[in-house]
């Protein structure tokens, strides 16, 4: 029999957070569903999100497909905290007037210049057929943090196994063929960059 000698740990070195801001306590979060958001991939949740940003600092977004038809601009201290970028989706359906047509780039999500925002755990999906769309315009500065965020793009995972578009899980299923994938790919080529860092944007 082999014996192992162990000693109890006398102390633990405190976690060095460095430049990475910590999430606020969960008691300070407001659940977007409790404010009336549906997250069903069909209902328009735009105004629910806009009002939440005006009233609350820490907005929790559980899993769901949240249709946002207009640009969403955060305040200086707004934090968007999603459950998981694979299941928490902010999406703009294809052909949305706010993001399609011709003109300057238009961001789904914008952080203010010098903001101290935290954005995490979400999937920003602008759809391939919104040609002016940018997923995120990031101008937040020191003390801000973006992590675990997914952007829509050249990704076959855009489709479910039954052919439904990830931009709208309720639409009529589309047969998956080389031709349909080619159409999507060419549509993405017309779109702007996904992450637009400008005006001194930075953070962690």
Q: Positions of the model-derived regions?
A:
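A generic local structural motif
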Residues: 47, 66-67
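Beta-rich ligand-binding surfaces for carbohydrates and other polyanions
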Residues: 135
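Extracellular "leader-to-stem" segments immediately downstream of a signal peptide or signal-anchor
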Residues: 1-59, 85-87, 91-120, 125-126, ...
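Beta-solenoid repeat scaffold
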Residues: 64, 70-93, 117
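Leucine-rich repeat
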Residues: 128-132
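Beta-propeller domains
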Residues: 190-193, 200-204
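Low-complexity, polar/charged sequence tracts that form flexible coils or short amphipathic helices
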Residues: 71-73, 138, 187-188, 197-199
């Amino acid at each position: 029999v082999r014996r192992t000698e162990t000693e109890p740990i006398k102390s633990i070195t405190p976690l060095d957070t460095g430049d990475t801001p910590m999430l606020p306590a969960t008691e300070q979060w407001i659940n977007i569903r409790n404010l009336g958001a549906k997250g069903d991939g069909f209902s328009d949740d735009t105004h629910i999100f806009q009002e939440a940003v005006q009233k609350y600092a820490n907005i929790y977004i559980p899993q769901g497909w949240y249709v946002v038809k207009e640009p969403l601009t955060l305040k200086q201290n707004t934090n968007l905290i999603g459950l998981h970028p694979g299941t928490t989706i902010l999406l703009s359906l294809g052909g949305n007037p706010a993001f399609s047509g011709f003109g300057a780039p238009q961001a789904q999500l914008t952080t203010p210049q010098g903001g101290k925002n935290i954005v995490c755990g979400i999937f920003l999906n602008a759809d391939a057929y919104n040609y002016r769309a940018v997923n995120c315009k990031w101008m937040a500065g020191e003390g801000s943090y973006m992590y675990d965020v997914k952007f829509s793009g050249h990704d076959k995972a855009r489709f479910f196994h039954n052919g439904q578009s990830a931009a709208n899980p309720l639409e009529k299923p589309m047969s998956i063929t080389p031709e349909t994938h080619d159409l999507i790919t060419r549509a993405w080529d017309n779109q702007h960059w996904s992450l637009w860092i400008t005006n001194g944007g930075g953070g962690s």
